[in-house]
Amino acid sequence: MDQFKHIDVKGAQALIEQNEARLVDIRDPQSFAVAHSETAYHLTNDTMVSFMDEVEFEQPILVMCYHGISSQGAAQYLVNQGFEEVYSVDGGFEASYRAELPVIAG
């Protein structure tokens, strides 16, 4: 895969519920602490190495940010690191929240 793909929040949730994909949230620590998707891994510069050590490169990765813009750059970065199936979640956390998908509030 040379390029990431786009996926909507419902499609992302379906992959998560099937235990097929790993969701990463790239928002800032304060926003993540206030609320984040139930299964989200907080991916930062500091957690990148541990994430790459524990995840299979063949496993689909869903990248979520605030509104689906920043996630595109992060998704492409993960593709460049060798992840085979990477998606940018369109609409980001905001769309996930509006769709009333499972959220943990801090």
Swiss-Prot record:
It holds the Pfam family Rhodanese. InterPro entries: GlpE_sulfurtransferase, Rhodanese-like_dom, Rhodanese-like_dom_sf, Thiosulf_sulfurTrfase. Residues 17-105 form the Rhodanese domain. Its main location: cytoplasm. PROSITE patterns: RHODANESE_3. Its EC number is 2.8.1.1. It comes from the Bacteria. The keyword Transferase applies. The active site is at C65. It is an enzyme of class 2 (transferase). Coiled coil: none annotated. It catalyses: thiosulfate + hydrogen cyanide = thiocyanate + sulfite + 2 H(+); thiosulfate + [thioredoxin]-dithiol = [thioredoxin]-disulfide + hydrogen sulfide + sulfite + 2 H(+). SMART domains: RHOD. PANTHER family: FAD-DEPENDENT OXIDOREDUCTASE (PTHR43031), THIOSULFATE SULFURTRANSFERASE GLPE (PTHR43031:SF6). This is Thiosulfate sulfurtransferase GlpE.
